[in-house]
């Protein structure tokens, strides 16, 4: 009975800030952590287990110590996950395995696109032109601009 009383006495925090991201405190830990860019469900579960937190617990009801443990595990991501789980293996510039999260995801994506454009690779040229990059057909789909109507022969002859 005492555990239920202590659980109900813990106040729910609706927003929990981890890794410069506001996370929903009403969700389970493993689902709430997916709100951080670069963290999927599998990695979120790994973070929770490494921090000693129940992945199915509600994030907003966790005590401050467990949230700090989660923050520490996320900050030291290179030490806590194997290289095959990282989203940026053998980085183009540095050659180091790393995991990119948060605002870094957009920055590195933009840098990669700029490198492709500067080297004039096929993908870079397609990105510059705003066309499909991954081999999709473009004959009839992916058109942009105003639609051009077809004029009938009778009206065309009068003009």
Swiss-Prot record:
InterPro entries named among the record's database cross-references: Rbsml_uS13_C, Ribosomal_uS13, Ribosomal_uS13-like_H2TH, Ribosomal_uS13_archaeal, Ribosomal_uS13_CS
Biological processes per GO annotation: translation
Entry keywords, A to Z: Ribonucleoprotein, Ribosomal protein, RNA-binding, rRNA-binding
Location of the region described as Disordered in the Swiss-Prot/TrEMBL record: 136-159
Coiled-coil residues: none
Record field: compositional bias (Low complexity): 138-149
UniProt cross-references to HAMAP family, sorted A to Z: Ribosomal_uS13
Naturally occurring in which organism (per UniProt): Methanothrix thermoacetophila (strain DSM 6194 / JCM 14653 / NBRC 101360 / PT)
Protein name per its UniProtKB record: Small ribosomal subunit protein uS13
Lineage, top ranks: Archaea, Methanobacteriati, Methanobacteriota, Stenosarchaea group, Methanomicrobia
